[in-house]
Regions:
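Active-site capping/gating segments
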Residues: 65-99
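Glycine-rich, N-terminal phosphate-binding loop of Rossmann-like dinucleotide-binding domains
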Residues: 18-20, 45, 95
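Interdomain hinge/lid region at the active-site interface
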Residues: 155-199
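Rossmann-like NAD(P)(H) cofactor-binding subdomain of soluble oxidoreductases
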Residues: 27-79
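Internal alpha-helical scaffold of NAD(P)-dependent oxidoreductase catalytic cores
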Residues: 85-171
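Short, conserved structural micro-motifs that define repeat-unit consensus positions
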Residues: 16-27
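N-terminal Rossmann-like NAD(P) cofactor-binding module of classical short-chain dehydrogenase/reductase
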Residues: 15-16, 42
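Single conserved hydrophobic/aromatic residue that forms the stacking wall/gate
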Residues: 1-7, 11-12
């Protein structure tokens, strides 16, 4: 991450961090150590509590904003970029009272230009709710796809038989396992609770 911006660039440019949540936790201190007072670092991970806890005592905590855009597809990487991905989508912001209000105001202007709908939420509540409405559906999709592949030796035949309902249900199983494994680990307690109720 830091090799992408060197010297004075590290100090003057705001950064949006869109990497797996375990990588955010390992890199966030280093990033915050290299910024100026006028730089805002925005994390876009799918879990919030552990990341917010990681930076709570950092001297540049005021230069950090925890955000989670509720937008995306099952695909990842630069080739999966979509022009209007964030248009009219929800953006959850956590612990905004700990962010410098001038920097926050600038960020809100950017999000407004992106036509995003802002929801403010505590990081603990975010992780609890997102376990039900996002993480649980990904686990279900991964497990359905895995179950079918393990049980059906003739995969071509079973996929020929499968209708649009099956295709829709396993669509999320195409998502990056590396990205989602770290999300599941970071939010494991809430996910276990949601799974117990689901089963």
């Amino acid at each position: 991450i830091c090799s992408g911006l060197v010297g004075s660039e590290m100090c003057i440019r705001d950064r949006f961090i869109a990497i797996p949540v375990d990588a955010i936790k390992s890199e966030i201190d280093s990033i915050l150590n290299k910024i100026s007072n006028n730089t805002l670092v925005v994390d876009l991970g799918s879990t919030k509590y552990e990341i917010c806890k990681k930076v709570v005592d950092h001297t540049n905590r005021k230069n950090f904003l925890a955000a989670h855009p509720i937008a995306g597809t099952e695909f990842s990487g630069p080739s999966a970029a979509t022009k209007n991905l964030f248009d009219n989508k929800v953006l959850i912001l956590c612990e905004t009272e700990k962010t410098d209000q001038d920097l926050l105001s600038d960020a809100l202007k950017i999000f407004d230009l992106m036509n995003m709908n802002i929801i403010n939420m505590d990081s603990i509540e975010h992780d609890k709710h997102i376990a039900y409405v996002s993480h649980l559906s990904h686990i279900s999709s991964f497990m359905l796809g895995k179950t079918v592949m393990n049980k059906e030796e003739d995969q071509d035949t079973i996929y020929d038989m499968a209708g649009s309902g099956f295709e829709s249900t396993v669509r999320l199983a195409k998502s990056s396992p590396e990205t989602w494994a770290s999300i599941f680990v970071e939010n494991k307690n809430n996910i276990v609770e949601s799974l117990n109720e689901y089963i």
